[in-house]
A protein has these predicted regions:
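S-adenosylmethionine
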Residues: 1-440
Length: 440
């Protein structure tokens, strides 16, 4: 099969449907097909446009498929989705989208489906979604917000007035959020350097020390990135790390650190002194942290493969601990559209809650009296956030909720059990954090 951006996008979509991990799959396919420049950008745009609008695309296509999409072979299904995405959302002429889709059936050895692909797309590309009649509000949200049933039901129940916007809201103004490396440049100097390189819309964010910018390609492809002038980290994530209030000379633990963005901010706050233990449960993810630390030039970080649900004698008692725990990810649905289709299985949710609680209990044992523990997630699920903190305080009366020194951006919902960022209210990712003080 000859390499071309449409074929690469379809191949990646087939694999993503089977395996998940959208960004890793796309990167691997782009490298395999040796795509660069515009072809690489076009393939990426098709891939993410399909993920972002899959619910809408599937609804339209199924109006013209009596047996449904599920009965089709995976390559044919993804060829249809990719072509409709191009015509509907990417300003590709209908004729070009349809003709290239028919060619792809031959490339993927599905020539027998070429007639179906041609007929379905010629009708689907002109479908008027305004004429759709939905069974109920859940189906409307699934189609117009492009979400699976479980996520749609969760949002409709917990955030009924914001549900659709939560699914599609572009956090950080649709820009990339960065953090300057103080070993190389302050915020103003970084903004000047980025602007001089032609990066557009460079400005300071609402979180102290954050920078927002619009890159033409990947921010990791910039020479300034390779030289360690900045790292990429969402504003909400930066806020959580700032609430740790790490200081020079202290012993600090980052228990669930990969890929390392918050570790870098903590090292910055410590002015590259003291000792920062940056941990993750998987060795390959620990290597991501090491790579980031080396690129930025911090020397006060020790990386460690560690299961944070267990006490590790290799870890010392700490002055401050960050526990950015595994979570359902329901706060970053616009950023990671594949999460919109996840199954919210009660048994798996119970396991996740137990893991979060175990990590909190480990942190409680490792923290010195008078120390600061920050718990954070990238979800807007109350069970994983406020209710998790309430249960922790019941188990650990030696802790109380603390008020961080950093000012929360407008729109944060602050309760007795922590602070919540909902994208539509703060302009940042959906995120929860709670600062806790160990009183004895």
């Amino acid at each position: 099969m000859a390499a071309n951006p449409r074929a690469a996008a379809v191949a990646a979509l087939v694999r993503q449907e089977q395996d998940g991990f959208s960004n890793l799959i796309l990167d691997a396919e782009l490298k395999r097909q040796k795509l660069e420049g515009r072809d690489k950008a076009f393939a990426s745009a098709i891939f993410y446009t399909v993920l972002e609008h899959r619910g809408t695309l599937d609804y339209i296509l199924e109006q013209f498929l009596p047996k449904g999409l599920a009965k089709l072979d995976a390559p044919v299904r993804e060829i249809l989705r990719a072509a409709l995405a191009q015509a509907r959302y990417m300003q590709v002429p209908v004729s070009a989208a349809v003709n290239e889709a028919v060619k792809l059936t031959r490339s993927f050895k599905k020539s027998s489906a070429s007639g179906l692909v041609n007929a379905v797309l010629r009708r689907a590309c002109t479908y008027d979604l305004d004429t759709a009649v939905f069974r109920d509000d859940i189906e409307r949200l699934m189609v117009l917000g492009s979400a699976g049933r479980d996520v749609a039901e969760f949002l409709h129940k917990n955030y009924p007035d914001e549900a659709r916007n939560i699914l599609t809201y572009k956090a950080d103004g649709g820009l990339t959020s960065l953090r300057a490396n103080p070993l190389k440049a302050n915020v103003a100097a970084l903004c000047e350097k980025l602007t001089a390189l032609g990066v557009r819309e460079v400005r300071q964010g609402v979180v102290p020390g954050s920078v927002l910018a619009r890159f033409e390609g990947s921010p990791a492809d910039q020479e300034l990135f390779r030289q360690g002038y900045y790292h990429v980290e969402g504003q909400a994530s930066q806020l959580a790390a700032l609430c740790v209030e790490a200081k020079p000379g202290e012993t600090v633990l980052d228990l669930c650190a990969a890929p390392g963005g918050k570790t870098l901010l903590l090292a910055e706050e410590m002015q590259n002194s003291g000792t920062l233990y940056s941990c993750d449960a998987a060795e390959n993810r620990v290597q991501l942290i090491r790579t980031a630390v080396e690129r930025m030039g911090f020397t006060n970080v020790k990386t460690l493969c560690n299961d944070a649900t267990q006490t590790n004698p290799a870890l010392p008692q700490a002055d401050r601990i960050l526990a950015d725990v595994p979570c359902s990810g329901l706060g970053i649905l616009a950023k990671k559209p594949d999460l919109r289709y996840k199954k919210l299985d009660p048994a798996r949710q119970a396991e996740l809650l137990a893991t979060q609680a175990a990590i909190l209990d480990t942190a409680a044992r490792l923290l010195k009296a008078g120390g600061r523990l920050v718990y954070s997630t990238c979800t807007i699920e109350p069970e994983e956030n406020q209710l998790q903190i309430r249960a922790f305080l019941q188990r650990h009366p030696e802790f109380c909720v603390a008020e961080p020194a950093v000012a929360f951006p407008a729109g944060m919902t602050v309760t007795e059990y922590g602070a919540l960022s909902v994208p539509t209210r703060t302009g940042m990712d959906g995120f929860f954090l709670c600062a806790l003080q160990k009183t004895r």
